[in-house]
UniProtKB/Swiss-Prot annotation:
Origin species: Morus indica (Mulberry)
Entry keyword annotation includes Protease: no
GO cellular component assignments: chloroplast; ribonucleoprotein complex; ribosome
GO molecular function annotations of the record: rRNA binding; structural constituent of ribosome
Subcellular location: Plastid, Chloroplast
Protein name: Large ribosomal subunit protein bL20c
One BP term from GO: ribosomal large subunit assembly
InterPro entries, alphabetized: Ribosomal_bL20, RIBOSOMAL_L20_CS, Ribosomal_protein_bL20_C
PROSITE patterns: RIBOSOMAL_L20
Keywords: Chloroplast, Plastid, Ribonucleoprotein, Ribosomal protein, RNA-binding, rRNA-binding
Length: 117
């Protein structure tokens, strides 16, 4: 069998992987096999965390809305506010409601008063 000389192509591939893993600790940034394994794990974790991030932000928005509502007794709970919003067909998403709750509470009170009428 003849020898295949492909020197710089494999080196380029390995250096690209090494640049990705340059911030990893120990052998995970030095040994090629462990670098490739860690790269796969890192990308899998990044994919999972993008889904988790969406859930976490939704939980944060709900918590913020609920805190403002309960603090000033506009409604008894978050769920009743959302229920009445849907009943009145005021389709404001939770992200916008959380921004209103933090930055301009009076506006949230005006919205809740409109629902009560």
């Amino acid at each position: 069998m003849t020898r295949i000389k492909r020197g710089y192509i494999a080196r380029r591939r390995r250096t690209k992987i090494r640049l990705f893993a340059s911030s990893f600790q120990g052998a995970r940034s030095r040994l090629t096999r462990t670098i490739t394994q860690q790269k796969i794990r890192a990308l899998v974790s990044a994919h999972q965390d993008r889904g988790r991030q969406k859930r976490d932000f939704r939980r944060l928005w709900i918590t913020r809305i609920n805190a403002v509502i309960r603090a000033n007794k506009v409604y008894y709970s978050y769920s009743t506010l959302i229920h009445h919003l849907y009943k009145r067909q005021l389709l404001l998403n939770r992200k916008i409601l959380a921004q209103i709750a933090i930055l301009n509470r009076n506006c949230l009170y005006m919205i809740s008063n409109e629902i009560l009428k």
